[in-house]
Design a protein with these regions (language model features):
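Metal-dependent catalytic core segments for phosphate chemistry
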Residues: 1-4
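Conserved hydrophobic core element of enzyme catalytic domains
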Residues: 8-127
Length: 127
């Protein structure tokens, strides 16, 4: 297990936590997935009200963005990651979703700059 481990990538630092545990009897990996996503580090708290506000502001459901990408093993093990800085493509366009961690003390200008910095590396991959 890791709590807020710092990982450094080209152009961005990222805090990563690894959580392990055992499910109560009668629950499976799908119950765990339903109970933990979207991740609290993405939504804020309280989670349900925060997601209501996010939907009001953004106008659409996030779908895969900030959802789970992962696998469920034949042994019932669940291994997931939160889909951030995600590109959705169809035959006509590519749409990039990225963001920063807004808090009560956040200032719009620096938050916007952080979002652009995070998205820049993805843009470069398409250049």
């Amino acid at each position: 297990p890791t709590l807020c481990g710092l990982e450094t990538y080209a152009g961005v630092h990222h805090l990563v936590s690894v959580v392990t545990g055992d499910l109560r009897d009668g629950l499976d990996a799908l119950d765990l997935l339903e109970g933990t996503f979207p991740g609290g580090s993405i939504t804020g708290a309280p989670k349900i009200r925060a997601m209501d506000i996010i939907t009001e502001i953004e106008g659409d459901a996030r779908e895969l963005y900030c959802g789970a990408i992962g696998r469920i093993g034949f042994d019932g093990a669940l291994d997931t990651s939160i889909a951030i800085r995600t590109v959705f493509m169809d035959d006509r366009q590519a749409v990039l979703q990225a963001g920063g961690g807004v808090t009560l003390l956040s200032e719009p200008g620096p938050e916007y700059d952080e979002t652009l910095a995070k998205a820049e590396r993805v843009f470069e991959a398409f250049a």
